[in-house]
């Protein structure tokens, strides 16, 4: 068993010796390179030399976009490359060592920071090691979580898209000292934010449409002075509106539909209509408050969803007003309001035909004229004797006794009057009875009084029914008007969002797509 362990021990000792020798070579190389090395000095052999620094941004996660704070949070890797002539070596002198890992704090860095941060964190999250090659070129890939400012346009919220950017520049060096440029691959500048499909995490609220990158020169610097270069990485992102459609827009549309459906309640149920409409109005106010907590507090624009909720509130208020007006019309009576001929013709003849509503046909003109005379208390044309109603107020026993005597006559008279005789026939019939005995004349007076009271009550009920029919027709007209307004307003507002799309190209007038060429 000891003989079987010897080969393993020899291999282990050989690996330790080789590792120690390789480590010793790295230590020796690092010591040689760091001898008289000052990380605070720019790696330029002459003062007029410019150090080229290339940048590449790799996006691994678009964490969030806070609309109220107007802050974009991203998880990125910043790839920076530059050359330092003081870190060159010959691999032959160090047993073929081609890569040296050096702590980033020990070498010169171009001080690239995020200019438009919102939390005061300008630098990267981890100062990882840099990779140094024999020609002195340095490769540094630090990770970072940045919170950058992003101006939010709330005009089409939640069907909006935003143009956010990450602006990088050197904190201490100008264009006469370093030259910022985009990294190149196969001779082509990487003018876009690189996304590794295997490492990238999709955001649930935002979809990336364009991700170009551009070099900009600080325009605020005087002409005689050197300005600062900026590398700007743009993110054109479009919101996924499904969350807001399901949780805000769809409930609002359904609740507002309930407000429209109150027109199917009877015209006299104005109190119930106002109660339902008021509850809908309160629910819409709650949704408007929820939207106000989401968007930035700005007066530059009104969000599309706020416009829609305000529109729904206006429609609901109009429904309440309509309900009050219809209730006022439905409760009118002939004693308080006289219906004009134009109102009767419009609401009881023309509009019901147009709306295909079933309305009871109007009474003949002669009966209408008789109702008019009854309403005004006129007895001309009716053979009623000049007897006060108080003369008929006899004791109950006497009335019952007389009633039994003239039961047949009264019944015949009532049948004549209830069967709706012609006015002329009624006059002839009652005129023939005037020559009868005083008892019959008293019976005629009583019958005429009862008939007049019944006709007046019938006319009163008919007048109430007419006003109720006017209320029904007006209610139907308001229903069609509010339904049309609701449908047209909803379609018009959301069609505005349909035409708010991300442009096909990231920069207007620039035909380049700022994307890698297809293979």
UniProtKB/Swiss-Prot annotation:
It is found in: Postsynaptic cell membrane; Cell membrane. Pentamer of two alpha chains, and one each of the beta, delta, and gamma (in immature muscle) or epsilon (in mature muscle) chains. InterPro entries: Neur_chan_lig-bd (IPR006202), Neur_chan_lig-bd_sf (IPR036734), Neur_channel (IPR006201), Neuro-gated_channel_TM_sf (IPR036719), Neuro_actylchol_rec (IPR038050), Neurotrans-gated_channel_TM (IPR006029), Neurotransmitter_ion_chnl_CS (IPR018000), Nicotinic_acetylcholine_rcpt (IPR002394). It is a multi-pass membrane protein. Residues 23-240 are extracellular. Keywords: Cell membrane, Disulfide bond, Glycoprotein, Ion channel, Ion transport, Ligand-gated ion channel, Membrane, Postsynaptic cell membrane, Receptor, Signal, Synapse, Transmembrane, Transmembrane helix, Transport. GO terms for molecular function: acetylcholine-gated monoatomic cation-selective channel activity; transmembrane signaling receptor activity; transmitter-gated monoatomic ion channel activity involved in regulation of postsynaptic membrane potential. Pfam families: Neur_chan_LBD, Neur_chan_memb. After binding acetylcholine, the AChR responds by an extensive change in conformation that affects all subunits and leads to opening of an ion-conducting channel across the plasma membrane. The chain crosses the membrane at residues 241-265, 274-292, 308-329, 477-497. The keyword Ion transport applies. This is Acetylcholine receptor subunit gamma. Residues 330-476 are cytoplasmic. SUPFAM superfamilies: Neurotransmitter-gated ion-channel transmembrane pore, Nicotinic receptor ligand binding domain-like. Disulfide bonds join 150-164. Glycans are attached at residues 52, 163.
């Amino acid at each position: 068993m000891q003989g079987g362990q010897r080969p393993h021990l020899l291999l282990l000792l050989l690996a330790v010796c080789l590792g120690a020798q390789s480590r010793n070579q790295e230590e020796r190389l690092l010591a040689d390179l760091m001898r008289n090395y000052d990380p605070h000095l720019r790696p330029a052999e002459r003062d007029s030399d410019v150090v080229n620094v290339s940048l590449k941004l790799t996006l691994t996660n678009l964490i969030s976009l806070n609309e109220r704070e107007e802050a974009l949070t991203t998880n990125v890797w910043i790839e920076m490359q530059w050359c330092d002539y003081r870190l060159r070596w010959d691999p032959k002198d160090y047993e073929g060592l081609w890569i040296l890992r050096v702590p980033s704090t020990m070498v010169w860095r171009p001080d690239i920071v995020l200019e438009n941060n919102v939390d005061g964190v300008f630098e990267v999250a981890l100062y990882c090691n840099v990779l140094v090659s024999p020609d002195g070129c340095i490769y540094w890939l630090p990770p970072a979580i940045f919170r950058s400012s992003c101006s939010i346009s709330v005009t089409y919220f939640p069907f909006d898209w935003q143009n956010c950017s990450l602006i990088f520049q050197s904190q201490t060096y100008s264009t006469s000292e370093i030259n910022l440029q985009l990294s190149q691959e196969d001779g082509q500048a990487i003018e876009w934010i690189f996304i590794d499909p295997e490492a990238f995490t999709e955001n649930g609220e935002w979809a990336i449409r364009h991700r170009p990158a551009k070099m900009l020169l600080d325009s605020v610097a005087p002409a005689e002075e050197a300005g600062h270069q900026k590398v700007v990485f743009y993110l054109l992102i479009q919101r996924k509106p499904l969350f807001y459609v399901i949780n805000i827009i769809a409930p609002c549309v359904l609740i507002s539909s309930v407000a429209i459906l109150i027109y199917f309640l009877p015209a006299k149920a104005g109190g119930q209509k106002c109660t339902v409409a008021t509850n809908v109005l309160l629910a819409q106010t709650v949704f408007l408050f929820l939207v106000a907590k989401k968007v930035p507090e700005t007066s530059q624009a009104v969000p599309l969803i706020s416009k829609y909720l305000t529109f729904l509130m206006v429609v609901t208020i109009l429904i309440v007003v309509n309900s009050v007006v219809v209730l006022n019309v439905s409760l009118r009576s002939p004693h308080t309001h006289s219906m004009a001929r134009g109102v009767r013709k419009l609401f009881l003849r023309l509009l019901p035909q147009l709306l295909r509503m079933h309305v009871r046909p109007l009474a003949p003109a002669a009966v209408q004229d008789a109702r008019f005379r009854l309403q005004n208390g006129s007895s001309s044309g009716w053979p009623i004797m000049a007897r006060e109603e108080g003369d008929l107020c006899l004791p109950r026993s006497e009335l019952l006794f007389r009633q039994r005597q003239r039961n047949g006559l009264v019944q015949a008279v009532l049948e004549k009057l209830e069967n709706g005789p012609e006015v002329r026939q009624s006059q002839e019939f009652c005129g023939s009875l005037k020559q009868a005995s005083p008892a019959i004349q008293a019976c005629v007076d009583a019958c005429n009084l009862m008939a007049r009271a019944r006709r007046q009550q019938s006319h009163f009920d008919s007048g109430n029914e007419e006003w109720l029919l006017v209320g029904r027709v007006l209610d139907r007209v308001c229903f069609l008007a509010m339904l049309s307004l609701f449908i047209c307003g909803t379609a018009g507002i959301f069609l505005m969002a349909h035409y708010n799309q991300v442009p096909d190209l990231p920069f207007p007038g620039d035909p380049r797509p700022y994307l890698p060429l297809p293979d």
